[in-house]
């Protein structure tokens, strides 16, 4: 496989049993002033390159595909996630010894995905001919103007995520332009649709008046000569939504590996190729040497090396 060509990148974070306000606030940069940026960059072990002057370029995409400044939604990410879980009737298993904490046996309820790609390609989409060093956290980029190309890429990626997991299950779509490489954080709830259990009774509809509908019991109570005025209609079973990481991402490691591989292929076909980005590689598609090199690296280090 040829590797020295511009490629899309998809990084699937660790599946979560819970989601804190701290994690959500970082994704949405809530409460991040200049001092906060300096403190983040002071942690040399994490190789951070946050640039405060580019904070204003960050944006998010909300329901309906509307682009707004990052962190402008009145309800923060962790609360939106909880609201969706409540809608789905999801209740985590709580730890018997520590009732205020979620048990290790609780099902995973949210998955974070980072969409990105070749550093130069995304920088060109975002900044055009403007020259800037995105790895310099102290550079003054206050006059940099974000270009249309990055909005197009983000919207296409948002539509892809909504098509894949359902717009109502895409809880956050945050695009960061203040780090070394531009990327989109997508926070999702894994949801499957299942048919309702139990028997569904038939309906009897009047031939001349479709609005007149009887249950089986009501139809049987009619005189025999009147029953002929109705036609039988089988009621379709409805569906219910429920949180299920295993049904969406795979029940076994092999299933998840296949899902991730297909995710890369689908993203290339729907989005990547439009922006000159070749198909990316899932972890299982890397060589053993590449796996060893990436195994203990965090997101920021990988971004800095792109």
In which residue ranges do the predicted regions lie?
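N-terminal nicking endonuclease/strand-transfer module with a His-rich metal-binding environment
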Residues: 1-306
């Amino acid at each position: 496989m040829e590797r020295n060509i511009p490629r899309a990148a998809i990084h699937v974070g660790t599946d979560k049993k819970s989601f804190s306000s701290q994690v959500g606030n970082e994704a949405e940069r809530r409460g991040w002033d200049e001092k906060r940026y300096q403190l983040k960059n002071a942690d040399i072990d994490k190789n951070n390159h946050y640039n405060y002057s580019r904070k204003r370029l960050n944006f998010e995409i909300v329901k309906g595909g509307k682009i707004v400044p990052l962190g402008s939604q009145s309800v923060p990410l962790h609360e939106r996630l909880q609201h969706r879980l409540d809608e789905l009737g999801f209740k985590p298993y709580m730890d018997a010894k520590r009732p205020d904490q979620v048990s290790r046996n609780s099902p995973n309820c949210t998955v974070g995905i980072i969409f990105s790609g070749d550093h130069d390609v995304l920088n060109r989409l975002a900044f055009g001919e403007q020259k800037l060093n995105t790895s310099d956290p102290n550079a003054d980029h206050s006059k940099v103007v974000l270009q249309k190309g990055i909005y197009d890429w983000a919207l296409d990626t948002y539509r892809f995520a909504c098509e894949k997991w359902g717009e109502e299950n895409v809880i956050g779509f945050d695009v960061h332009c203040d780090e070394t490489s531009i990327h989109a954080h997508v926070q999702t709830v894994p949801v499957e649709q299942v048919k309702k259990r139990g028997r569904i009774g038939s309906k009897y509809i009047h031939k001349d008046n479709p609005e007149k509908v009887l249950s089986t019991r009501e139809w049987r109570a009619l005189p025999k000569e009147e029953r002929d005025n109705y036609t039988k209609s089988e009621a379709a079973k409805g569906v219910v939504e429920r949180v299920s990481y295993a049904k969406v991402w795979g029940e076994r490691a092999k299933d998840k590996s296949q899902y991730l591989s297909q995710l890369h292929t689908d993203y290339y076909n729907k989005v990547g190729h439009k922006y000159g980005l070749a198909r990316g590689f899932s972890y299982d598609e890397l060589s053993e040497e590449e796996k060893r090199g990436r195994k203990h690296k965090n997101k920021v280090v990988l971004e800095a090396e792109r």
